[in-house]
Amino acid sequence: MNSTLSSQVENHSIYYNFSEKNSQFLAFENDDCHLPLAMIFTLALAYGAVIILGVSGNLALIIIILKQKEMRNVTNILIVNLSFSDLLVAIMCLPFTFVYTLMDHWVFGEVMCKLNPFVQCVSITVSIFSLVLIAVERHQLIINPRGWRPSNRHAYVGIAVIWVLAVASSLPFLIYQVLTDEPFQNVTLDAFKDKYVCFDKFLSDSHRLSYTTLLLVLQYFGPLCFIFICYFKIYIRLKRRNNMMDKMRDNKYRSSETKRINVMLLSIVVAFAVCWLPLTIFNTVFDWNHQIIATCNHNLLFLLCHLTAMISTCINPIFYGFLNKNFQRDLQFFFNFCDFRSRDDDYEVIAMSTMHTDVSKTSLKQASPVALKKIHSDDNEKI
């Protein structure tokens, strides 16, 4: 595309489409700015892999948890909610964003123009606040084990509140997202006839900046700070408890289990924060001064940041499910199209909020009074 066409479009002052915290830049570039075919092919493979892993991983996780009655505890209910929101992101966010960024015009119609960013914003809000509720449950189980503990009913209520909050905070995308051909109206080239762009058209730049800044705090910095505080307190408590047990007896298994829990807790939070940090920085910089980012580098930089953020949809099934032996065993049945067998006697009950393994019902029936006393004592120390 020549520089004259670029100037014509720039006169309309419509350079970008900020969609659910995911900026979309209308990069009307010259020929030197086009991404190489090899790069496009590589990005397409990467996006395809993330979509497949995100959809299959979260779908498997949801089916496995819902299929097993033994697994319907507070944390697993929240994990299903988290996986469902990640599933929506993988379906509604990845393919549409990738195609739109490469094509620089919207081809999916007016309904999807409004629905796509709305669903994306809802899904991301649900994901981060599901992590918040999981952190709250873990905090109560570890820091205050004899105090208030969330029940399944509390989990369902919390999920309902999360979705209401997510929908309410995402409504501006339904209201202000528009499908228009305004950037192409004065363009005479046939290639741009009947082409449309999808972008948010707020009342003013100040309104848009206020809203996007609110989302930045609501969807990233605020929840992450809260989660880090909860897990830091958990880490301190587990460390003290581990030191006390080392003084009382040599318990290498418990020490190893505590260490694994600490690594798991830290990995969950760090993975989410690291995945979303590049896109968060990109959107923040672009919102306040989009001219900082060179036009030719915009699409590629955005896609790399966006792809990194979307990897988080694949990480959650790994951390919450596939590192669990029960999930690994059930996953084999899932992909072999076999029925899940009932394991009332030998199913290994996992308190996902702590990754603590309880003994099976069979072993409880065969345990001696001394062993039962020890088991109950260990249950009081559940983390």
Swiss-Prot record:
Its main location: membrane. GO terms for molecular function: neuropeptide binding; neuropeptide receptor activity; neuropeptide Y receptor activity. Residues 66-76, 138-154, 233-260, 321-383 are cytoplasmic. Keywords: Cell membrane, Disulfide bond, G-protein coupled receptor, Glycoprotein, Lipoprotein, Membrane, Palmitate, Phosphoprotein, Receptor, Transducer, Transmembrane, Transmembrane helix. The chain crosses the membrane at residues 45-65, 77-97, 117-137, 155-175, 212-232, 261-281, 300-320. Disulfide bonds join 113-198. It comes from the Eukaryota. PROSITE patterns: G_PROTEIN_RECEP_F1_1 (PS00237), G_PROTEIN_RECEP_F1_2 (PS50262). It is a multi-pass membrane protein. It is found in: Cell membrane. The modification Phosphoserine is found at residue 368. A lipid is attached at residue 338 (S-palmitoyl cysteine). Residues 1-44, 98-116, 176-211, 282-299 are extracellular. The keyword Glycoprotein applies. Glycans are attached at residues 2, 11, 17. One of its GO terms (cellular component) is neuron projection. InterPro entries: GPCR_Rhodpsn, GPCR_Rhodpsn_7TM, NPY1_rcpt, NPY_rcpt. Receptor for neuropeptide Y and peptide YY. Belongs to the G-protein coupled receptor 1 family. This is Neuropeptide Y receptor type 1. It comes from Sus scrofa (Pig). The gene is NPY1R.
